[in-house]
Curated annotation (Swiss-Prot):
Domain of life: Bacteria
Catalytic reaction list: uridine(55) in tRNA = pseudouridine(55) in tRNA
Function: Responsible for synthesis of pseudouridine from uracil-55 in the psi GC loop of transfer RNAs.
NCBIfam families found in the cross-reference section: TruB
GO MF annotations in UniProt: RNA binding; tRNA pseudouridine(55) synthase activity
Lineage, broadest ranks: Bacteria, Bacillati, Mycoplasmatota, Mollicutes, Acholeplasmatales
Keyword terms, alphabetized: Isomerase, tRNA processing
UniProt-listed Enzyme Commission number(s): 5.4.99.25
GO term, biological process aspect, one: tRNA pseudouridine synthesis
Enzyme class: isomerase
Family as reported in the entry's similarity comment: Belongs to the pseudouridine synthase TruB family. Type 1 subfamily.
Name recorded for this polypeptide: tRNA pseudouridine synthase B
Length: 283
């Protein structure tokens, strides 16, 4: 079987733990996830099964939505409360100041520096491993976009709840730091829940305990809304051998599905350049 599970990951469990438990529960050979969710965080994790593990890239580029709580005036090495507390401040803050800082990031594109404790690689090594070795490195920033950023509670006891919708590659821990910097203080993540990945919603996810085999979204169902190209038997043989396609065979300008004359799914084609497409996944 090849497809995807929408899983509601609990706090304290790693994304790897989720993969391991699903693999054990259903006796699958190949299982993977589409993007790490920190142990501190709960919420939506998309888990790939079988050949669909090769489709994780489709989810990586999708935007994400989170809700959670920021903590101010405390500096942790990991930028969340699970890390080591390095320093504290006693900067007086209020709702107006917090709201002003929130508004400055709403619908904003900026260059964000990932946390040192992250899986981003520097010269082939993951940064969290360098951090554990107390190595200081220059972290290259990445361009991110904050689609929506909303304060969801009154500021109280140095805490405030939030809702945020962000582009791929955005670290909410870094956003906590950057938000607080505008207030001349420290910021960290106290709580985080991922509620959406693209159009995939947490409300449609299940816990590992409640997950059933019929909850698997088959790869053919996932691609049902894609443009399709039905080819004759001769061209299907070429497709199965990895042949590229161009404007002579297709009229679409976006990724599509190739089917045979019986409308069986054969391959998913992605864009290589303006007039050329290549098979990125075979059913």
């Amino acid at each position: 079987m090849n497809g995807f599970f929408l899983v509601n990951k609990p706090e304290k469990m790693t994304s790897h733990d989720v993969v391991f438990q699903i693999k054990k529960k259903f006796h699958f050979d190949k299982v993977g996830h589409t993007g790490t969710l920190d142990p501190l965080a709960s919420g939506l994790l998309i888990v790939c099964v079988g050949k669909a593990t090769k489709l994780a890239f489709l989810f990586d580029k999708l935007s994400k939505t989170y809700q959670g709580t920021f903590l101010f005036n405390k500096h942790y090495d990991t930028l969340d409360v699970k890390g080591k507390l390095l320093d504290t401040k006693n900067i007086p803050l209020n709702d107006f100041a917090i709201q002003t800082s929130f508004a400055s990031f709403h619908q904003k594109k900026y260059w964000q520096i990932p946390p040192m404790f992250s899986a981003v690689k520097i010269k082939g090594q993951k940064m969290y491993r360098l951090a554990r070795q107390n190595q200081v490195v220059d972290i290259p920033p990445r361009e991110v976009f904050i689609h929506h950023f909303e304060k969801k509670s009154l500021f109280c006891h140095d805490q405030v709840d939030f809702l945020v919708h962000v582009s791929k590659g955005t670290y909410i821990r870094s956003l906590a730091r950057d938000l607080a910097l505008q207030l001349n203080t420290y910021g960290a993540l106290l709580r985080l829940q991922r509620t959406a990945i693209g159009t995939h919603l947490l409300q449609n996810a299940k816990t590992i305990e409640n997950l059933e085999l019929n909850d698997l979204i088959l790869d053919s169902i996932f691609f049902a809304s894609y443009d399709e190209l039905i080819l004759n038997d001769y061209l299907i043989k070429l497709v199965k051998n990895g042949t590229y396609l161009d404007q002579r065979q297709i009229i679409t300008q976006k990724p599509f599905i190739v089917k045979d004359s019986n409308k069986n799914f054969v391959a998913y084609y992605d864009i290589l350049d303006e007039n050329k497409y290549y098979p990125r996944y075979f059913f």
